[in-house]
Amino acid sequence: MNQFLSILTVRTLVLFVVLSLMLVMSARAQQEWTHSQYQFNLFDANPAYAGSHQTLSLAVRHRSQWMGMGGAPSSDQFSIHTPIAGDHAAAGMRVVSDRIGARTQLTAKGTGVYKVRFQRSKLAFALTAGVVRQCVDVALLNAQDSEDALLLGLNQARAVPTVGASILYTSSRLFVGLDASQLNRAGWNYAQDAGSRLYRHYSLVAGVILPVGEGHLIELSSLSKYAEGGQWQAEFNAQFLYRNRCWIGGGYRVKSGIQGLLAWMISDHLRAGLSYDYSVGQQFARPASSVEGFLGYTLQKRSAHSMRYF
């Protein structure tokens, strides 16, 4: 049995390395939407994760990006998901408020998940639908002609529908998932010959768990995102879990920067996380810092097993 588990762990690690190499070869540039703590709530990276905590789960997150820069992005997020119909289905919802410069965008999405269970793993399929509301505060643009038709159009909030689909495979040692969002490419028209559009986004997430002793483990994970039009982003992370309570880790975002993170199981129901990003690259005239905070709550007590494995 021990030999079988060793072979399984090696095969799992090899699969993760192969997936990571695929991601890094395609990574080219950073895109706008970024989170550094997706490992602690995979629902952020892949909606098919909904219900995986086997109880009602809530999470809030705040991110301040490139602090000290005028008009820098910031984001607030609330998510909730729960299993339904035993463990064969799940439902979830995310509400995200993004701000960058004069633009504010509010996104609300609902997710339905169906799960196929195997002996030691499961495959989840998700469909997501929601609305995206966007508005531009013209007063922050310092425009010379405040009566310009285009500016008046920008100042009006508009909402459009959005749909997506996801698939996620999980076992006790491995997770691999693919997500596609904004598939309908909805757009806004602010004035004649002027507008914007939600481009399709695709993401691939993968991770492997490596036990290193009783109550301790190492998690290696990677996330690659592609935005229609040629924008790529890939990142690689490693975390160490100490005594089933404290996560300490870091990561590298290709051609963008490094990050450090700390998470703590405050109780069997409550967990918190904090990350710090140090960004460098051709797109920055000087180094920039970002901070992200995370707080998650599960309605029922999570077992040591479920706490250890993402």
Question: Which stretches of residues belong to each language-model region?
Answer:
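Generic detector of intrinsically disordered, low-complexity segments in short proteins
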Residues: 1-2, 309
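Sec/Tat signal peptide C-region and signal peptidase I cleavage site
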Residues: 25-29
